[in-house]
Amino acid sequence: MQAYQKDFIQLALKAQALKFGEFTLKSGRVSPYFFNAGQFQTGSALASLGRFYAQALVDAGVEFDMIFGPAYKGIPLATTTATALADHHQKDMPFAYNRKEVKAHGEGGTLVGAPIKGRVAIIDDVITAGTAVREVLSLIDAAGAKPAAIVVGLNRQEKGQGELSAIQELEQETGVPVISIINLNHVLQYLETQGDSENLAKVTAYRQQYGVE
């Protein structure tokens, strides 16, 4: 585990974006942990998040020409990632986002920011079913651009309806790589280093039942 990945977990725990307990998911599964990027609610937390997303993107070695944030949670994430790329990696990238409702006045349309062109890195919090990100892929395709990668905070490494995770299904279907700052293996590693045997046992059992590699 890289230092920034451990820092991300610690920030998520401090902000209560990552919690341990019993949480009923939309799928009906009772999960021993829950992740909600909406809990990162301060300027400092967002600045740190931007650095983590930027580092994950740079480490992956993906070539890209711009940043895109899907509405709504992806918008601040894309903004802070673009800022971090400029400040820490000397990559001054254009960025854009979409709104969920079409605006009839002013500039109109659903897209805001830089024109969608070239290779587009999409920044989002998580991929659950992949519906929202598929809509964004359609927008990028319609603009004549190409998706370079999708970057998320956490990959739950968890089966969907079949044997594959939502992320694996999306990668197979679209050919677009999905990069994550951390995955469930990193969470397990962190719990082990902290000596948190109770949560480690619960998350390990959940992973054995629903996990994918």
Curated annotation (Swiss-Prot):
Entry EC number(s): 2.4.2.10
Protein residues bound to orotate: F34, F35, T128, R156
Protein's pathway: Pyrimidine metabolism; UMP biosynthesis via de novo pathway; UMP from orotate: step 1/2
GO biological process: 'de novo' pyrimidine nucleobase biosynthetic process; 'de novo' UMP biosynthetic process; pyrimidine ribonucleoside biosynthetic process
Keywords: Glycosyltransferase, Magnesium, Pyrimidine biosynthesis, Transferase
Residues noted as binding 5-phospho-alpha-D-ribose 1-diphosphate in the record, renumbered to the chain: 26, 72-73, 99-100, 103, 105, 124-132
GO CC annotations, alphabetized: cytoplasm
Enzyme class: transferase
Reaction(s) catalysed (UniProt annotation): orotidine 5'-phosphate + diphosphate = orotate + 5-phospho-alpha-D-ribose 1-diphosphate
Quaternary structure and interacting proteins, as annotated: Homodimer.
Role: Catalyzes the transfer of a ribosyl phosphate group from 5-phosphoribose 1-diphosphate to orotate, leading to the formation of orotidine monophosphate (OMP).
Family: Belongs to the purine/pyrimidine phosphoribosyltransferase family. PyrE subfamily.
PANTHER family, A to Z: OROTATE PHOSPHORIBOSYLTRANSFERASE 1-RELATED
Protein name, per record: Orotate phosphoribosyltransferase
